[in-house]
Swiss-Prot record:
Native source organism of the sequence: Zea mays (Maize)
Sequence ranges of Basic and acidic residues compositional bias: 23-35, 339-358
Region called Disordered, residue ranges: 1-247, 337-374, 454-478
Protein name: Ninja-family protein 8
Composition bias, Low complexity: 233-242
Biased composition (Polar residues): 169-179
Taxonomy of the source species: Eukaryota, Viridiplantae, Streptophyta, Embryophyta, Tracheophyta
Length: 478
């Protein structure tokens, strides 16, 4: 009877049966055989020597189980003395082989973790043929498993009985060294993970570098703009409306240049008209340089150290130096000597009317002021009346009053003489003179006729007091 591998089962059974019977007869003679047989029967589940051993499949399963036990425990005793005869080579010999079955080479370590213990379907394929060759089924299974493990490291491999089982990555070879598939699989797994991590890190670094470069670029732009090295760039709409782009600073080009944060015209056509303040005169105009950098008008600081305030240049008032109250002094009503014939030519002027209190120690300054007032009045009256007192006037009584606004005139004709008088303001535009010879109040024209007509009478009354009316000085002060 032959199986698939060409083994003669009848020869094996006959050998096994004859050897079993022979060993059973010799068993009582050797006391050492009993513990070995018991040990072997307890470990391998074999029958006693008296029991018939006619089934070869049971022996093959026992041999496979014993081989697996020897792989897990290398110190376990071999079954060289399986039948209790240590001296003889008593082992089941298969197909004329000299070496017993127990001394045949074990299966390679690739079966660890893959070949189940209770594999009865493939027991005939696992039966040893010779001591130096592997079974064809074992080689085929090894190749299939090697290819499956190398192609799909994480796939599930099937065991010999058809059950699904998770196959590990590492593959053991005949010499006990681990194959390269484990390193390759681990390197691929680590490489894929490290590649993803590297991509994320590179993207994160790139974003951080971009942000840092943008911040540095904006900081450099701000620093350059503050130092005046870089000019801000404006678009067309922003330059026309005067809006600045965010992040740009207004550059100061020179020490005497101030940047304005709004759009102003390059030239100021004329002084502004202020409707709310009719007495408020406009100020000096602001000098503007033509727009150079994107329509930005820049004010230049002149020698007068003009300062640009926070509002447009057209609203900057100018200081009128000729104004009486421009330097903090309140306006005053000033008295003046006016004449009707000169009023339409020079206009109305306000002068001091002399209401300030006179001091005794300041007579010289008051006299000079009176002379100025007389000059203003004489310019209106003509050159016939001059300020001052005539040298031939004689004063009696309380004496002369040098602080009064004295005037003198010379009469025309053969009878003309020099007379003096004191002027005072009679009306708004009228001045009268009190003559010193008679004390008569008269107008400037009458005063001039009095100097021409009354010359003889004036000579006769030389001893008359110069001021017959003593209240003329008081009236003049009022």
């Amino acid at each position: 009877m032959d199986d698939d591998n060409g083994l003669e089962l009848s020869l094996g059974l006959s050998l096994g049966g004859s050897s079993g019977k022979a060993k059973a007869r010799d068993a009582p003679l050797e006391p050492k055989a009993e513990p070995q047989v018991e040990e072997s029967s307890s470990k391998g589940g074999l029958q006693t020597p008296d029991a018939p051993s006619g089934k070869f499949y049971q022996k093959s399963a026992d041999n496979h189980e014993q081989n697996s036990k020897q792989r897990h425990s290398p110190v376990a005793p071999q079954f060289g003395n399986f039948w209790g005869q240590p001296g003889n080579s008593s082992g089941p010999v298969v197909d004329g082989s000299v070496e017993p079955v127990s001394h045949q080479p074990q299966l390679s370590s690739y079966q660890d973790g893959r070949m189940p213990i209770n594999s009865g379907n493939n027991s005939e394929e696992q039966k040893p043929v010779s001591g130096n060759h592997k079974l064809p089924s074992e080689e085929m299974n090894f190749q299939k498993k090697h290819q499956t493990a190398s192609d799909q490291p994480d796939a599930f491999s099937k065991s010999s009985d058809g059950g699904a089982k998770n196959a590990p990555i590492s593959i053991s070879t005949d010499d006990g060294s681990t194959g390269e598939n484990e390193d390759v699989a681990e390197s691929e797994a680590e490489g894929s993970n490290s590649w993803l991590v590297a991509q994320r890190e590179d993207s994160a670094k790139g974003s951080v570098v971009n942000k840092g470069s943008d911040r540095k670029r904006s900081a450099d732009a701000a620093a350059d703009g503050f130092k005046g090295k870089r000019q801000p760039s404006f678009s067309g709409s922003e330059s026309s409306s005067g809006k600045l782009t965010p992040g740009n600073l207004i550059s100061m080009q020179a020490s005497n240049v101030v940047a304005l944060p709004y759009q102003v015209p390059g030239q100021v056509s004329g002084p502004p008209v202020l409707t709310n303040a009719p007495n408020f005169h406009p100020v000096c105009t602001v000098q503007l340089r033509p727009p150079t950098n994107g329509g930005l008008a820049v004010q230049t600081m002149g020698s007068a150290s003009q300062v640009a305030f926070g509002y447009p240049a057209v609203q900057l008032p100018t200081l009128e130096t000729g104004s009486s109250w421009a330097f903090g002094a309140p306006p005053q009503a000033l008295s003046s000597f006016t004449a009707k014939d000169k009023a339409d030519q020079t206009g109305t002027k306000q002068v001091d009317d002399g209401k300030k209190p006179q001091e005794a120690g300041a007579s010289s300054s008051a006299h000079a002021e009176d002379e100025k007032k007389a000059d203003r009045g004489l310019s209106l009256m003509g050159s016939a009346i001059r300020p001052g007192i005539a040298p031939n006037v004689k004063f009696g009584g309380s004496g002369s009053y040098p602080d009064l606004p004295w005037v003198s005139t010379i009469g025309a004709g053969p009878n003309g003489r020099t007379i003096s008088g004191v002027t005072y303001k009679f009306g708004r535009n009228e001045v009268k003179i009190v003559c010193a010879c008679h004390g008569t109040h008269m107008s400037p024209e009458e005063f001039m006729r009095h100097a021409s007509a009354d010359a003889p009478a004036q000579d006769n009354s030389a001893t008359l007091p110069a001021f017959p009316a003593g209240n003329q000085a008081t009236s003049a002060e009022n």
